[in-house]
Swiss-Prot record:
One matching Pfam family: Actin
GO molecular function: ATP binding; hydrolase activity
Coiled coil: none
EC category name: hydrolase
Taxonomy, superkingdom: Eukaryota
Protein name: Actin
Main location: cytoplasm
Keywords from the UniProt entry: ATP-binding, Cytoplasm, Cytoskeleton, Hydrolase, Nucleotide-binding
Length: 375
């Protein structure tokens, strides 16, 4: 493989797709992982309506489209739509010919075996990639933070995982998954705003609520205390202007929404909160490495971007951990993109170049080669 050809790094999240070139410090393209199809028959002939739209274009025409997310809970469930997203990534966003660049894709922890095979097959057969590799998202986030040991709490739009990693290897028996992430918090905010009399029903209006969530929500250090403060004064209230000019006011919803991460029972889910899940994950690991994990709890993903989340996590885990244990929460400012950044670092390492699956190897062994080469 010649030096000058940059590898492509694509982090396919449930909510957003992050794509760019290895060696860059940030992704070139970040767009929603959505495919939209027209809800109505086009009436104006020659308008050039397409039968499907991807990413930002689907987002901007959302009023007339039905939006679908091909990745649910971090795992690809609709391969035809996924192919459209990859096609869009190569040809419209990065403007590259995929047959000229090695491709590094990311996958969710505990991704089913046949899924990695399918990804491998599509990259080699549909897009003719010269070389390919697939890497676990949480491991890449840890690389991006400059560590090889730690526990990653990765929470995006579709799924949350706690992944303990020791010397660069994830420990599958201790990985825990919670199907509670950004999308569920958006749904929950829709619900609690409804109690205030604000109705958001269409998929387009839910995107507005997502924006409200990202701009105004935060995690309370002490939830009960914060509720009292909110009830007694209006200092926590903020206003938000809707696209039609109407202004809405939001108060305790600001911290009630992300509180569901710590108390999933608010959503009617019988799951442990992110703090308890992180602790449970650590407890599934060998006694000897727990100290290293407590001292390196790394946050990653868009749903860890709330103000106050690291302090709250510190407080909750310190309460669960043995009293003498040093607990350290690492929350890098670029954690929204740390999976992608880790991929960019990995794919540009000189030692990594012999790790790629070459097209010739694929042609010889078929899709199952991915299990031998990528672990």
């Amino acid at each position: 493989m010649e030096e000058e050809v940059a590898a492509l790094v694509i982090d396919n999240g449930s909510g957003m797709c992050k794509a760019g070139f290895a060696g860059d410090d940030a992704p070139r393209a970040v767009f929603p992982s959505i495919v939209g199809r027209p809800r109505h028959q086009g009436v104006m002939v020659g308008m050039g309506q397409k039968d499907s739209y991807v990413g930002d274009e689907a987002q901007s025409k959302r009023g007339i489209l039905t939006l679908k997310y091909p990745i649910e809970h971090g795992i690809v469930t609709n391969w035809d739509d996924m192919e459209k997203i990859w096609h869009h990534t190569f040809y419209n966003e990065l403007r590259v010919a995929p047959e000229e660049h090695p491709v590094l894709l990311t996958e969710a922890p505990l991704n089913p075996k046949q899924n990695r095979e399918k990804m491998t097959q599509i990259m080699f057969e549909t897009f003719n990639a010269p070389a390919f590799y697939v890497s676990i998202q949480a491991v890449l986030s840890l690389y991006a933070s400059g560590r090889t040991t730690g526990i990653v709490l990765d929470s995006g739009d579709g799924v949350t995982h706690t992944v303990p990693i020791y010397e660069g290897f994830s420990l599958p028996h201790a990985i825990l998954r919670i199907d509670l992430a950004g999308r569920d918090l958006t749904d929950y905010l829709v619900k609690i705003l409804m109690e205030r009399g604000y109705l958001f029903t269409t998929s387009a209006e839910r995107e507005i609520v997502r924006d409200i969530k990202e701009k105004l929500c935060y995690v309370a250090l002490d939830f009960e205390q914060e509720l009292q403060t909110a009830a007694q004064s209006s200092q926590l209230e903020k206003s938000y202007e809707l696209p039609d000019g109407q202004v809405i006011t939001i108060g305790n919803e600001r911290f009630r929404c992300p509180e569901a991460l710590f108390q999933p029972s608010l959503l009617g889910l019988e799951a442990a909160g992110i703090h308890e899940t992180t602790y449970n994950s650590i407890m599934k690991c060998d006694l000897d490495i727990r100290k290293d994990l407590y001292g390196n709890i790394v946050m990653s993903g868009g749903t860890t971007m709330y103000n106050g989340i690291a302090d709250r996590m510190q407080k909750e885990i310190t309460a669960l951990a043995p009293s003498s244990m040093k607990v350290k929460i690492v929350s890098p400012p670029e954690r929204k993109y740390s999976v992608w950044i880790g991929g960019s670092i990995l794919a540009s390492l000189s030692t990594f170049q012999q790790m790629w699956i070459a097209k010739s190897e694929y042609d010889e062994s078929g899709p199952s080669i991915v299990h031998r080469k990528c672990f």
